[in-house]
Amino acid sequence: MTDLIQAPESEQTWPASALGPQQRAAAWERFGTEQFDVVVIGGGVVGSGCALDAATRGLKVALVEARDLASGTSSRSSKMFHGGLRYLEQLEFGLVREALYERELSLTTLAPHLVKPLPFLFPLTKRWWERPYIAAGIFLYDRLGGAKSVPAQKHLTRAGALRLSPGLKRSSLIGGIRYYDTVVDDARHTLTVARTAAHYGAVVRCSTQVVALLREGDRVIGVRVRDSEDGAVTEIRGHVVVNATGVWTDEIQALSKQRGRFQVRVSKGVHVVVPRDRIVSDVAMILRTKKSVMFIIPWGNHWIIGTTDTDWNLDLAHPAATKADIDYILQTVNTVLATPLTHADIDGVYAGLRPLLAGESDDTSKLTREHAVAVPVAGLVAIAGGKYTTYRVMAADAIDAAVAFVPARVAPSITEKVGLLGADGYFALINQVEHVAALQGLHPYRVRHLLDRYGALIGDVLALAAEAPDLLSPIQEAPGYLKVEARYAVTAEGALHLEDILARRMRVSIEYPHRGVACAREVADVVAPVLGWTAEDIDREVATYNARVEAEVLSQAQPDDVSADMLRASAPEARTKIIEPVSLT
């Protein structure tokens, strides 16, 4: 896919969607000198979706993120684009219908290179009532979202269920139901939404922290931002500011010095990652727990297992998993596995935070996953709550509210028809895998790996190796990835630090037992020429990354949130000028 919107050649020689060092410098200059229609705060999937929605309506958009794209909730989900089967029990039919429609849209049109169908087994444990009860729920699930490109449910005997999942205890089920949902690399998807927004003209910049809201009388007219890398400060003027910061919603709202229309309650969810051979199964699984459900999701050569659902009132940027969280996950899945998992089986662990709309319930698992849009003060729109899957609808609703402050007639949302970068041409390239592999001297499985991460942008990735063939070799201690992917991460995907690359552009930090430590220096050497790192810079980046991993691993042996949080907080920040938390000035 080529860029449709580009600046004059004298001003720009790289694609508008390429978030590299040159674009980052140019964005800073534009922020301080131009008037924008919409300023979006937050580089998660909802903020990126807001930027895309506004840009494709013809608005002039700035998107700022204090850390990295998808560095919060949007890289730490259960990796599913799903309707939320469990929400049917809470009678949230509208939410499930909306999410299923969005799932189908992304699977077939918007992001087929990123969102993939995934068969699930729902093991049945009660002989009389459970099968008709669950079958009715899944039947409703199959029908609610309209057209479907995945198969309908299939009922299985115990023997049939065990053929799909031989790793289950025979005594753990009496039968099962197979149904379909989808899986997605959430961080890559969010990044692609943001880059698609840039493709259509949005000015996107990471490491750009909002430290104040600009006011003119009773109206918000922009933001003051601080560069999280060097501490430089500038101001961005906009007709309207959209607060799409997820778990930081209340913090940004406080900058307005006005009471918000809703509050966000933060819930922590923990997942563990184990090698694929530790659980023998051809399908994903969903297990009922006392409070919610537990997912076992295939993820390349691994399984992702989770999640927990507990209140979190500590560091929002670096939520910590505890030994108690991990023990709970292992104990839950071991009730059904023929060969129990142990801590020694775990290659990776991650904790994420859910921004839930605060309610009367003390149980976060019962709080609504619906979203809300509010205008707490003129010129400021806030969007919070919701599910990852419904990001596009959330973004459209937020921009619908924002356009009231734009002094021009604005077109309605069209993102239902706008494929993400890499989608156009993906299916044709899938049919040409052997040809592309022969052309590049790569194994076909490598080409398929790249297509399922970059889609039709694969040519841009491989072009970086044209004059440096060594970039097509695997990263030595993370052979699932090629060196060229690291180079592309800093050339076109906005990565500024090793953590950005190893935890989000790639998923080395959860897929390898060393969590990226063993390959940090090799990757630093690959990206240093693009980022202008000196030998001293490389040493500092590697040391910072290693210290953060060490603190994270140690925190996962702690018995409670407070002690785990203290350990994580003891590690240095890669973004040395970040302010946490932002306070009123």
UniProtKB/Swiss-Prot annotation:
FAD binds at residues 37-65. It comes from Mycobacterium leprae (strain TN). It catalyses: a quinone + sn-glycerol 3-phosphate = dihydroxyacetone phosphate + a quinol. GO terms for molecular function: glycerol-3-phosphate dehydrogenase (quinone) activity. Pfam families: DAO (PF01266), DAO_C (PF16901). Belongs to the FAD-dependent glycerol-3-phosphate dehydrogenase family. The lineage of its organism: Bacteria, Bacillati, Actinomycetota, Actinomycetes, Mycobacteriales. It comes from the Bacteria. Keywords: Cytoplasm, FAD, Flavoprotein, Glycerol metabolism, Oxidoreductase. Its EC number is 1.1.5.3. Its cofactor is FAD. GO terms for biological process: glycerol metabolic process; glycerol-3-phosphate catabolic process. It is found in: Cytoplasm. Coiled coil: none annotated. GO terms for cellular component: cytoplasm. This is Glycerol-3-phosphate dehydrogenase. InterPro entries: DAO_C, DAO_C_sf, FAD-dep_OxRdtase, FAD/NAD-bd_sf, G3P_DH_FAD-dep. Its main location: cytoplasm.
